[in-house]
Structure formats: structure tokens, C-alpha cells
Amino acid sequence: MVYSYSEKKRIRKDFGKRPQVLDIPYLLSIQLDSFKKFTDQDPTGERGLEAAFRSVFPIKSFSGNSELQYVSYKLGEPVFDVKECQIRGVTYSAPLRVKLRMVLYDREAAAGTVKDIKEQEVYMGDIPLMTDNGTFVINGTERVIVSQLHRSPGVFFDHDRGKTHSSGKVLYNARIIPYRGSWLDFEFDPKDALFVRIDRRRKLPATIILRALEYSTQEILDLFFERVEFKIKKDTLVMALVPERLRGETASYDIKDAEGSVLVEAGRRITARHIRQLEKTNTTELEVPVEYIVGKYAAQDYIDPDTGEVLVSANSEISLEDLAKLSLAGIKDISTLYINELDHGAYISDTLRIDSTTNRLEALVEIYRMMRPGEPPTKDAAEALFQNLFFSEERYDLSKVGRMKFNRRLSIPDDEGSGVLSKEDIVAVMKNIIHIRNGFDEVDDIDHLGNRRIRSVGEMAENQFRVGLVRVERAVRERLSLGDLNELMPQDLINAKPISAAVKEFFGSSQLSQFMDQNNPLSEVTHKRRISALGPGGLTRERAGFEVRDVHPTHYGRLCPIETPEGPNIGLINSLASFARTNSYGFLETPYRKVIDGVITDEVEYLSAIEEGRYVIAQANIEVDANGRMVEEQIACRHKGESTFMRASDIQYMDVSPQQIISVAASLIPFLEHDDANRALMGANMQRQAVPTLRSEKPLVGTGIERTLAVDSGVVVVAKRGGYIDYVDASRIVVKVNEDELRPGEAGIDIYNLTKYTRSNQNTCINQRPCCAVGEPVVRGDVLADGPSTDLGDLALGQNMRIAFMPWNGYNFEDSILISERVAQEDRFTTIHIQELSCIARDTKLGSEEITADIPNVGESALSKLDESGIVYIGAEVKGGDILVGKVTPKGETQLTPEEKLLRAIFGEKASDVKDSSLRVPNSVKGTIIDVQVFTRDGVEKDKRAVEIEEMHIAQARKDLSEEFKILEEGVLSRARNLLLGAGFTETQIAAMPRKDVLVQVIDDEAKQTELEQLAEQHEELKADFDKKFEIKRRKITQGDDLAPGVLKIVKVYLAVKRTIQPGDKMAGRHGNKGVISKICPIEDMPYDEQGNPVDIVLNPLGVPSRMNIGQVLEVHMGAAAKGIGNKITAMLEEQRELAEVRGYIKQVYELGDEVQQRVDIDSFTDDEVMRLAQNLKGGIPIATPAFDGAKEKEIKQMLELAGLPTSGQLKLYDGRTGNEFERQVTVGYMYMLKLNHLVDDKMHARSTGSYSLVTQQPLGGKAQFGGQRFGEMEVWALEAYGAAYTLQEMLTVKSDDVNGRTQMYKNIVDGNHQMQPGMPESFNVLLKEIRSLGINIELDQE
């Protein structure tokens, strides 16, 4: 493999055995592609905004004399960029402008004669835009729209599993689900009649809907039944014989062939052998006794030819009297319905008998009554209602997906078709459910991923936009019908408010629009790849059963079987598998390699869950020879959702990668294959809660996906084009672009601005640091700067800690963690948290609030950190209770005391008119002020601090832009100088020229002269562009802010808090091994090895066997080897060994392992590159052991040998306190530990006096409410068990809800009198009132 200059800085040793056929696709594409489809102009009009507009327009007036047509739309440019939106607290959106055409028709002239056409561009609200990283900024906060897994539109057949009826009979049902519109259900009842429901309302006999579709009884019977033909001959009947129909029946008469010999005697069961004999003898007719027809149903009406009287009506039972009547009337041929209990049930025939309607109108009225109970039906209303239910494109849409699923399920050859239902569709569904009831077909599996599809951002936004448009449509139609249209323009008809409101509601408050989880890069990516079954149109937690939540065979390679939350949402919220993507219909697909005649090709095809069922698919870990032919004869594979063994020649596809089945979070766990799934689930979930540490450190033992994740997450800065680094500082990187990647006539400079110390959604710190140096070559895709939790472009969520598995004086009992003081001293787990505190000055009824340093009754010392405007200065160190922003609020006139009146008379000032309402630092918070923002309403005078901040921002903008301009100008000038050099000018001549003259020289070569003129033109453009950009920036900075009504000023103060690790913080490994720090132990007391190196963390070995996450032990061994190799390299460098020896050792390390795919050609590295690589490997060689394809035990032992460590992975340890050796050797190595965002500082809380609940008068609960500790029934039992009566009494009275007792006790404590008198708890009064509310009077006897 060829490595770029920056990749050679540190290469991860990969133990993967399988070739990488396909790179993991871009991780955020599910979000970005979906939204792109929504906003991009689609000429076909099948999706996005275009589809929404075309579905609603044209809007015709009621009279038909005018209509409003849609022409095209365009999205404008957003006013503020993403960062400005976050600071100002506004939505990152672009205005939508739509070109509409209003057409007026001439009433007098012939139909369709156009009288007037007016075209105009109309503003239709703002559409929120997606940032480059797949998020939305709504009101200043980053949000993610989670994709939804919902039941695909189409037709589904199911049964109730025998749960509806007490007999346990299985009742079948069919449901047609449209994309929008009414649901149509067919269901059998226990008596085998077929019923229909519309929108889950009252059920009606299913034949009513057929009558409403203009089918007569005769036609209905012909649709669903075959006929049996009889001829009447004297005393017998002759039946037309279809031998197959007799199978399984018991002969009620002798069956004879044409010659009259008996084939089946009466009372015998007819078998397949008998049928074959009948077919051989070509018997076409059978004589049957007259009684045979009795009880069968007539297939048509039989009418007396003379009188016209109906002798036997269709679907009525035939009796001997009916036969006699028919004979008399001279009717010789009779048809009956072919009904057979086994496989041709009389369902429709039975249903027709229940059906009270006889014609279309009655059926329509019946449907109308069911849909609109209590309304008087009229013919027109009933027809219109039925028409609108399933046959109107405005009200009903199966959608493209729905039509495809519908047609495929009912074996209709074409995938395309109308979005509304037809008569034939409804009949086909009824036929199919009868087919299933007859036992010829299977019901569907609704949890199969072929029946559930993904609805992503774009589709949901489009639906919401359509909702807004439909609201507008009603208003437009009314306006078109009113008033004089000659005066009106399209703009006067359209009100953009409903559209904006619908879109805003979706992005702001939909269940699927979620506050982004921004703890670390992994949590961001996982959140964007989350697939939820909840939300509008989805399931609810309460209704979701076990089957929906369970892992389904079709999840393979599509949804991760591991990563899902614990708790009530388990299985309802899933994560996309690493290689999965959605197809054009919204179904999940996963890639497979094609296999032809047992030979694996590199051709990759994506298959959906439905397609996959047809093929035989082998796993990725099968043995293959050098030619790609499968070695084994019998191969483990999957077919139709089952695991089986098949011959190599039968295999059609093979998995692309062993990591294919799991999500990115799960594939970050090394040795995942050795962990129990429950613990792997916790490991995958807890990595998302890791807080970015002060100094990120790459994991020594990783899986090789760390780089992909860091790059795709968008937290690192990635080079867009190749070149070399021209300039680097903490906030900017400048890359001079390679000649061959330049666009003609451009400066060839790329500038990357870095994000510094900003706050994330979870209050962690986002900060980017350059990881490149001036002069270094860069290729496209190289990482130029690290973000939070990344190290040299690798995801780095935690720290590599030296671990020993041993008990230590009970300090690691029950998953507690003992850590060394050194970890705290070296700031290994120190994290920075940034809090945003806001102070809002409002206009109140009594006057406006004021931000000032002049605060009543506050001493000088408390104001020491404020400037003259009353706002804290940047860099101030503050603690709980300090004033950050001084604010006074006017208060109403109160009754003055005589002393105050005297003071007022002497000094004549109204000092007491305002009260202090300053913003203070919350208790228990201590930190440094890193930024202050002041937002002032338009028209309100800016204070001194606001002006200062503005000037500072303008100066910064000018500096940034002028530096950018200088860099770009230099780029243009250097290209011009090169041209002049090539045209015969000497270097001294060029150097002596003033800058402005370089571009105005005259050259003989015409082509070069043209190029120079182009450069001069470009220089002018740059200048103009600079002025324009600066003016826009200045205007944005100085303009007033759009604040909420009644708000005059907002001051936001950002406070950076440094949190060191301490007892009570939660830590975890990557294998679900979590625990709480119990003690920080002095370094000298920690166990140490023979070299005197103490361990960092002591874990309890009992946490491993019962949890079955052995992956952590293998990680510790491998970590020890990786660190040991790093130590060896360090020793070599310190001893200044020959470079060849270092090169040889590094080469040996990278070549270790059986059949590993990675090839690192250390020999081709220059001496400098080897030296830099060695320097970067001093802390340990990073290792990749991919999930299901990782390092074997043998390879771990080889690594330990290379590192000069015992292959057992165990060392002698000595007790730090006594110096004695422990009696057994201890497993010591390196494990990657994470500090989770469950910090004791955020949880620790104690209540003194505080607020009480209104009804029970008990203290509130929780830190946010400054609540008390709950003393529940179990705690009461404990005190009862100990007989601690007085303690229990005060817990239940004065410390809780004895209102008088607690007030009295407070006074007593203040007076120094430590007495208490418990009274009646308020909760007892509540109980009395509850009982009285039931009408039972209870009174207490006061004795």
C-alpha cells in the first residue's frame, strides 16, 4: 500500500486477514444524499420540493375561470453562515422563491380561451439548510433529523395467531396501506365470512365494497367461484367431471367410468390413484343421484321463460322442490358454485348472504353511514365520499414504492402503475386473501426489512412542506373565487405563513428532530446514522411487542444487531450497519461480492432484503486459495434467512467484509468476537458518552476504522486539494495547491480556518489543533488539524492506561475502579466543559431592566470582576455566587419605613426603586470566563462593552480578510513572476519591480501575455471581492439583533470549567466493563513491577468471567505488547543505535502475523521518514485488530516476544505499601479507558431549605429543583427493622411534610433550642381527602 507523507507519520499495524474489497462508504451519506434530493431541482418531478409543488399546483378556482400554475422555484443564499447562526441563536436557512403564473380565462369566449397571464416570483418562507456535516442549525442549536423505519406502503397479509377468538381459530386479514390516505382492511370472522374496514372503523361485509364498485351478485360469484355443471336427465343428474376436484372427498355414490365399471365404491375416500384412473378412461361425465345437488348453491338466477319469475336466485341453496320447478319450466342445465371445505371455501358466498345491500346505491349509503354516522346520506354525497376514499389522487396516494410492493405481492408483472386503487386491485387483494385462507399461500412477515422502509430527512421535510402547501391551497382557491382578479397578482394570493409554520414545526418540535448528541465525534456520527421505529406514523413504545424489537435475519448487513439502547427503547432504535445504504425505494441494501462457479470475483452488488432471499450467500471468512476459488467442499452460507451448508458451486454471493453486519460504534471494539453480545451492546453505547480529554491519545489497540470515523465525522480538517503547507498557526492553515490541481486563472491557495474553544451541545469543548508543519507535502484527503477526541487523524476517545487485574483491599469491589494519583497529576482524564450563561434585560410594566455595574446593596469586592458596563471581563476566574452580569429590575412602590423616608428626604434619591437581579455563577461551579457576547435590540443604544466587542470583531474580520487577501495576492504575483521569468526577465529585474507593476508588464509571447492579463484581471477581482466581503462582514457585525418581543439586551457569558478526575466519576473500557472510581491512591501505594513501574489502574478480575467479555483481557495483552515495542524503540533511540537497526526492528514488527493483508514497505522510506515514524511509535505501536478478523492468540504471543515480555502476559507485582511480592503473577497490560459524561460534579447535591410540592407539601426531587433525597418504603422498612423509631418519625414528619413542625424546628435551630415537636404529615391529610372524595367520611377523634 502507498502511504502519503502525513500517513507515514504513524502507521497502524493491521492484523486483518481479508482483503479490503470495498471501502466503508461515506458515513453521513444517508443524511446528506436525502436532503440533497429534497433541495435539488428534479426535472422528472418525482421527489423533493418539485414533487410537492407539482402535486398541489395548478390550483383552479371553483368556477374554473382562473388558475394558479407553478413554473419553477429557486433557493436563495442564507443570510448568515453556520457559525453566525449558532452565535446569534437563529436558524440556518435560505429563502424559497417560487415563480407562479396566474391564468385568467375568458368567460364569454369558448372554453380554454386565455384572457390574461401574469407571472411573478413569490416568497414562500425559509427552508432550513443542512450543514456540510449533516446537521441543521435551528434557533442556534445543532439538531439532527433521525431517519425513521416505518412500514412500507403496499398490501400486507397477516393473521391474528389465534388470539382474537376464544376457540383459537386463526383469522386471516389483509391491509392495503397507502403512503397517504385511508387504510383498507379485509378480515375473516370466526364464521369464515369476509369483512372490510375503512380506517379501522366499524366492519361491513366485504361484498358491500364490491357492490359499490358496480359489481352485481352474478359478477361477484363469477369472480370468486368456479362452476359445477349439471344436466337433468329423467331421474338422475349428469355432472360434468373435473377429476381433480374429487381428490380427498368421500364418494357418496358409486363412481363409474364410461363403460359402467365401478372405479370407486360409495363410502370410499377418493385418492390420487383413483383420479389417475378417471383421467385415463377419459371420463367427462358422471351420473350422480338427484340428492347430490341438494344443499349446493346456484351459480346464477334461473328464470321461468314463460312468466319471467325467478325460480332460483343466484347464491341460494337448491332444494328438491327447486329441482322440480326447474324441470317443469323446461330448464335442463344447472350450474352450481364449486365449494370444497378443504381448499375452495364458501367465504364470499356466505358473505353475500350476510350482506343486506342489493345494489350500488345501497352499498354506497351503507359505507357513508359507517364513515359519517349521524349525517343524512344523499346520493351525491355518498358517491363523492367513496370516490375520494381510494380513487382520488388528491386524497389517496400509494406512492411509487407502494405501487411496486402492491404489484409484486399480487404477482402483477409491471412495477409501475397508478397511485390510486382500481377495481381490479381491490378484487385481486380479496382473491389473494381467500387464496391464503384456502391454504395456497403464506402470510407476510411484517418485521422483514423488505416490508419496512427508511424515511430520511428529505422525504419527511417534503411531506411536511406538502402539508403547508395544502393549507395554502385552500386559501388560494377561496381568493381566486372572490374579488376582482384583474387587479390581483400571484403574490396577493399566497400567504407564506402556513408553509413556514409547517416546516418550522417539523424542524423545531418533531419527535424525530433531536438535539444533536455532540459528546464526541462518534456520538455525532452514530446519531446521524440512527434509525428509529418511533415517531409520527411509526410505533409507540407501549404498543411495540417483542417481535418488532427482536433481531431479524434480514438485519444482516443492514441494521446492527448489537447497537441499540438498553431500557424501554431496546430494539426500536437501531443503528445503520457499516456498509448499508438505502435504495431509490427507501429499502436498506447491503453489498455482496459476486461468486461465479465457486470463484469469488471483485464485482460488488448491493442487494435489498427481498432480493437477498433468492440467493445463496457465503460469509466473508471462508477459506479461499490464491485464485479466489473456495477451498472447502461444504460451505456455511445463508439462504432464505436460514443458515445452512451448501456446495461451493451453489454459492452465488459472498459477504464483502466481516464488519459488514455491525455498526461503526460496534466495529470500534477490538476483539469484539470474544465478547458477549450484551456487554458489547454496553461497550458500543458507552463509547458515545466518552468526554474528550484535554490531550487526546490514540488507542494502542484499535480496529482500523478510527481514521475513517474521524474524517467522516467532520471534526477534523481535511485537505481538499494536494500541495504543501505554506503557513500554520493555531487558528489557520494555508495550503499552496499543486499546479496540476489548479483551476485555470486562480491563485492556487486554500485557506482552512480552525474552530477554537467553542461549546458543544453537551457543554464539552470543541477545539481544533493543527497537526502539520510548514513545508510538509499534502495530498487530497490528508488530515491537517485534529478536532476534539482525535489524534493525528485517528479517533481517540480515551487514554491508554496501564492496568492490573487484581483485588486491592476492597477498593475494587463490585466494579469499583482504583486509580493512581499519577493519572490525576498528569491530567490524563482532565476535561474542559464550557457553559453558556445568559442574562436577559427585558422591558417590564414598571420600566425597563438595566445592565449596569451600579447594583444596590452589593459591596465593592463583588463588583471587582465587572467592567464599567457591568459585564464580567474575559479571563476572570470566577466561583459560585460571583456576579457575571450586573442587572437591576425596577420594583413597584412599597410602603416606606420612617427611616427610609428620612433618608429619602435628606438625599432625595430613589435608591430603593430597583432590585438586584444579576446573573450569578451557579453554586458548585468554578471556572474561567473565555468569551462574552452582547446582543442589543435594533434601536436600543449599545453600551460601551457592546461597542468594544463590535470593534474587536470588525478588527478581527479585517485582519482575517486582509491576511487571506495577502496570501491570495501573493499566489497571483508568484505565478506572474514565474511567467515573467519564462519570458526572458531576470530575477533581479523582477525583484526590483514594485508589486503593482508585476502584472502590467508587456511580453512578446502572446499566450503568456494573455495569461498575465488574466492574472491581472484576477487580482482586480480579488481586490473587489475583499472590499465586498469586508463590507458584508461589517454590516453583519454592526446591525442590530432580532430579539424576542420585550427583550432589550442579551448578554451571553461563556465559562470554561476544568474537571479533573475524582472519586465518583464513571469510567469504562470498550467492552462494557464500566465502573465508578472508588479511590485515588498515592503513587507510592500502587502495585509496581520488578522495574519499579507502578500501574495506573487496578481492576477487579471478578468483573470478567461472569460478564463473558474476554475481549478486554486480550486487549490488555495486546496493549502490553504494543507499549513494549514502543519502549524498545525508545530505548534504541536513546542509545542512539544505528538507523538500520531501528529500521530493521520496525520492519520486523510490521511483517509479523500470518496471512495479514497489510504490506508496509519500510525499505522504501527515507531515513527522515523512518526517524519520524520511530519518534511517533515511542509511546507504543498502534494496532488494528478488526472485528471478526482480528489478531489470533498466537500473534499476540509473537508480539509479546518481540516486545521482550513474557508470553503469559503476566508479571510479578509488589505491594506498594509493604514492598512484599504478591503471591501470584498478575495480568498487567494496557487498556483503553474512557471517562464517561456522568461526572460526580454534576450529580453531587445536598438540600438545605428549598421548594415544596404543592399538594403533598413534600420537598421536590432532583438536583435541578434543588430537591431532597427520597426516603421510600424500602428505606422505611430498614429503619423499622432496626427499631429506630425516633429517626423514622422525624424522617416522615419534620424533615418531610409536617408543615407546622418543620417551620417550628427551623426557628428552634436558629434560636439554639434543639427541640422538635412532630405533628400531622400533610400526606395523611391528602389521604383523608382522597378517601372523602370516594364518599367515605373519615374524621380524627381529638382526645
Swiss-Prot record:
It catalyses: RNA(n) + a ribonucleoside 5'-triphosphate = RNA(n+1) + diphosphate. It is an enzyme of class 2 (transferase). It holds the Pfam family RNA_pol_Rpb2_2. The keyword Cell inner membrane does not apply. Keywords: DNA-directed RNA polymerase, Nucleotidyltransferase, Transcription, Transferase. Its EC number is 2.7.7.6. GO terms for biological process: DNA-templated transcription. The keyword Nucleotidyltransferase applies. GO terms for molecular function: DNA binding; DNA-directed RNA polymerase activity; ribonucleoside binding. Signal peptide: none annotated. GO terms for cellular component: DNA-directed RNA polymerase complex. The RNAP catalytic core consists of 2 alpha, 1 beta, 1 beta' and 1 omega subunit. When a sigma factor is associated with the core the holoenzyme is formed, which can initiate transcription. Belongs to the RNA polymerase beta chain family. DNA-dependent RNA polymerase catalyzes the transcription of DNA into RNA using the four ribonucleoside triphosphates as substrates. This is DNA-directed RNA polymerase subunit beta.
